[in-house]
């Protein structure tokens, strides 16, 4: 958690500096790096692929948590349908998914101002409730001593390679926001505000989350009387459920769902809407773009990902292989090719002009992105090649390095 928070905050600061300095959103920032037409490639990757999948993943996770709430309020809820499934999803969870999806969409359609206000009160409220839950979990685990001495039993030995792989996947979860953090930092009053705010905010929140997680896991271990499956997708919900008190369990799960909903609305549906609007203004508005993310995010059957950890790991490797190179190319372009100086007239080029790149596409950036993606994902096709398998396991880090170095080698020729 600590390593992830440090890495993510550094990514936010470095990649958000251009937007903070010039007040431009991600859609415009990416035009400088990839060209006014070439920008559609990374923009679609960020706004659509990640937005679609994360909407589905977050909503199904929230739905599984909501199952516990409904079963506490309406005993027997989880037996609805008698084991019948709908597209591979149990009927009770399908109902919970529909409810969470509708709530998320309604919040999104309320508008960006409401989203901002919702996020501002949701985050503190969630943490207050989680801290209360932490104290109850510690008590349930038999005291602070038991929590501090708690050590999950790994299914395989912990190695350096395994540790880096874990950190890479954790960072991949936040790789999308690293890429389009400019949509947030563009509103900063100065370039120094993100430098101070992100590290403090990330470190405090992640360390608190780590403490809460360990406390809940220790509580679950104490209640279950031994080892627990830390790889189980619903492990955190099970840990909350182990507290026992129905009112507290319901309150904590609802708080967790509020936080998850705020994340998917602000961190995934909104970027999807913004990117679709920026690239296809005649076809989409910010609201309709977000709705597309919700619909497609459901049609991909996201519950198949959370039910199969292999699929989930594949997804994190995939997004790491995409976002790592994009972030690396953007950093190399801004700090070395541009020397932190952007030409806004070129970025906001009139329709029909090339914006400083032949045909409006920076093929060097696009080429580096493609090569980086192929290299980092090759390990999935050739798992027997140890080097490629390791590169794939460290997809975000390796993709970032390959994209950064690759663009330094072929792309950093300063334009007049």
Predicted regions and their residues:
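Membrane-interface loop-to-helix entry segments
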Residues: 63, 95-139, 198-202, 315-324
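Membrane-water interface regions at transmembrane-helix termini and the short interhelical loops
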Residues: 15-17, 33, 41, 99-122, ...
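Hydrophobic, membrane-embedded alpha-helices of multi-pass small-molecule transporters
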Residues: 96-103, 136-141, 151-216, 245-266, ...
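Hydrophobic alpha-helical segments and their helix-loop junctions in multi-pass secondary transporters
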Residues: 63-72, 125-152, 173-174, 214-223, ...
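C-terminal membrane-solvent junction of multi-pass transporters and transport-like membrane proteins
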Residues: 327-409, 413
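Selective recognition of specific alpha-helical transmembrane segments in multi-pass small-molecule
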Residues: 6-11, 46-58, 124-140, 169-176, ...
């Amino acid at each position: 958690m600590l390593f992830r928070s440090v890495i993510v905050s550094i990514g936010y600061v470095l990649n958000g500096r251009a937007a903070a300095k010039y007040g431009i959103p991600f859609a415009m920032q990416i035009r400088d790096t990839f060209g006014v037409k070439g920008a559609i490639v990374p923009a679609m990757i960020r706004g659509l692929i990640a937005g679609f999948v994360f909407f589905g993943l977050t909503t199904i996770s929230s739905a599984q948590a909501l199952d516990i709430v409904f079963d506490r309020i309406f005993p027997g809820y989880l037996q609805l349908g008698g084991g019948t499934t709908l597209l591979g999803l149990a009927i009770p969870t399908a109902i919970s998914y529909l409810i969470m999806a509708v709530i998320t969409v309604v919040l999104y359609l309320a508008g960006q101002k409401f989203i901002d206000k919702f996020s501002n009160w949701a985050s503190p409220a969630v943490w207050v409730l989680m801290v209360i839950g932490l104290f109850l979990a510690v008590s349930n685990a038999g005291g602070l001593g038991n929590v501090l001495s708690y050590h999950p039993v790994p299914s395989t030995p912990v190695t350096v390679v395994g540790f880096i792989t874990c950190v890479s996947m954790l960072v991949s979860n936040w790789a999308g926001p690293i890429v389009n953090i400019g949509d947030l930092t563009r509103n900063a009053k100065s370039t120094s505000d993100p430098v101070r705010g992100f590290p403090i905010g990330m470190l405090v929140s992640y360390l608190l989350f780590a403490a809460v997680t360990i406390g809940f896991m220790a509580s679950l271990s104490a209640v279950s009387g031994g080892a627990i499956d830390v790889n189980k997708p619903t492990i955190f919900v099970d840990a909350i459920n182990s507290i026992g008190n129905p009112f507290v369990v319901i309150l904590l799960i609802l708080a967790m769902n509020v936080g998850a909903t705020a994340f998917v609305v602000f961190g995934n549906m909104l970027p999807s809407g913004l990117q679709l609007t920026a690239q296809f203004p005649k076809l989409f508005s910010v609201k309709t773009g977000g709705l597309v993310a919700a619909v497609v995010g459901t049609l991909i059957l996201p519950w198949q990902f959370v039910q199969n950890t292999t699929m989930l790991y594949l997804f994190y490797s995939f997004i790491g292989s995409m976002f790592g190179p994009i972030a690396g190319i953007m950093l190399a372009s801004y700090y070395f090719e541009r020397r932190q100086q952007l030409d806004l007239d070129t970025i906001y080029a009139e329709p029909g002009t090339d914006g400083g790149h032949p045909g409006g596409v920076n093929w060097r950036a696009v080429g580096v992105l493609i090569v980086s993606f192929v290299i980092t994902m090759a390990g999935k096709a050739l798992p027997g090649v140890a080097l490629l398998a390791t590169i794939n396991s460290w997809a975000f880090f390796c993709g970032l390095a390959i994209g950064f170095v690759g663009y330094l080698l072929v792309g950093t020729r300063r334009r007049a």
